[in-house]
C-alpha cells in the first residue's frame, strides 16, 4: 500500500535526522531504517532531499487546511509552534545545501502556497508586480526565521511571533485565505 510505504520512509528519515547530521544521512540508511528495498525507495523519492522536503510539505499542507488555520496569522502560529517543538529536526534540515536544500524548498513551497491562496481569492489572478516583490521578500524572510529559530536565536512564544510575522505581510494579502467554498470542499 503506497501510503504505508511512503509513511515508513518519511518516519525513518525523521528518526535518523534526530540523531544524525543531514549530510551524513544516506539513502541506504533511510532504506535500512524503513525496511524497504532500493527499488521501493526510488519508486517514491529520488533522493534524501526529496524525503526531507516531503516532510515539510506534509506539515504545511496539514496546517494550511481551512479547518486548522483561519488565516495567515494562525498558520504562522502553528508553524512556529511546530518548529519549536521539532527544533532538532529543523536545525539539522537547515544544514542541507544546494538546489534541493530545505531552505530553498521552504521558500518555493511557501511562495506557491501564498500564490494559490491569492488566486483562489481573485478568480485565478495572481500577485500584482508589487505584491510579487513583497511576497518574495516575505518568503525569503520566513526561511531566515526558520534558520534563526533552529539556532534558538529567538526567545519568543509562538503567538507573539505569529503576530509579528502577520504584521510584516503585504497588507493587500493579509486578509486573504481559502474562500468558503474551497474550505468546505477540503
Where do the protein language model's features map onto the residues?
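An amphipathic alpha-helix adjacent to DNA-recognition modules
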Residues: 2-14, 18, 23-27, 32-35, ...
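Short, residue-level hotspots on alpha-helical faces of the histone-fold
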Residues: 11, 54, 58, 108, ...
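Cytosolic nucleotide-binding catalytic cores of signal-transduction proteins
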Residues: 18-20, 126, 151
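Short, hydrophobic secondary-structure boundary micro-motifs
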Residues: 25-26, 91-93, 102, 158, ...
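Residues in the helix-turn-helix
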Residues: 40, 89
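Amphipathic alpha-helical packing segments from all-alpha helical-bundle domains
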Residues: 77-78, 99-125, 129-144
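Secondary-structure edge/capping motif, primarily at the C-terminal ends of alpha-helices
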Residues: 90-94, 118-122, 149-153, 176
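C-terminal peripheral helix-coil segments that are non-catalytic and often amphipathic
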Residues: 148-186
Amino acid at each position: 500500500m503506497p501510503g504505508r510505504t511512503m509513511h515508513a520512509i518519511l518516519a525513518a528519515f525523521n528518526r535518523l535526522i534526530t540523531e544524525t547530521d543531514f549530510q551524513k544521512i544516506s539513502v541506504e540508511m533511510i532504506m535500512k531504517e524503513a525496511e524497504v528495498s532500493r527499488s521501493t525507495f526510488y519508486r517514491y523519492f529520488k533522493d534524501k532531499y526529496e524525503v526531507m522536503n516531503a516532510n515539510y510539505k506534509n506539515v504545511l499542507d496539514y496546517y494550511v487546511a481551512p479547518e486548522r488555520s483561519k488565516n495567515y496569522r494562525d498558520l504562522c502560529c502553528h508553524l512556529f509552534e511546530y518548529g519549536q517543538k521539532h527544533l532538532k529536526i529543523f536545525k539539522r534540515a537547515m544544514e542541507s545545501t544546494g538546489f534541493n536544500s530545505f531552505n530553498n524548498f521552504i521558500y518555493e513551497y511557501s511562495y506557491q502556497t501564498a500564490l494559490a491562496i491569492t488566486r483562489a481569492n481573485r478568480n485565478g489572478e495572481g500577485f500584482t508586480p508589487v505584491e510579487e516583490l513583497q511576497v518574495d521578500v516575505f518568503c525569503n524572510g520566513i526561511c531566515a526565521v526558520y534558520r534563526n529559530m533552529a539556532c534558538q536565536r529567538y526567545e519568543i512564544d509562538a503567538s507573539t511571533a505569529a503576530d509579528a510575522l502577520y504584521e510584516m505581510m503585504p497588507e493587500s494579502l493579509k486578509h486573504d485565505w481559502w474562500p468558503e467554498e474551497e474550505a468546505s470542499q477540503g
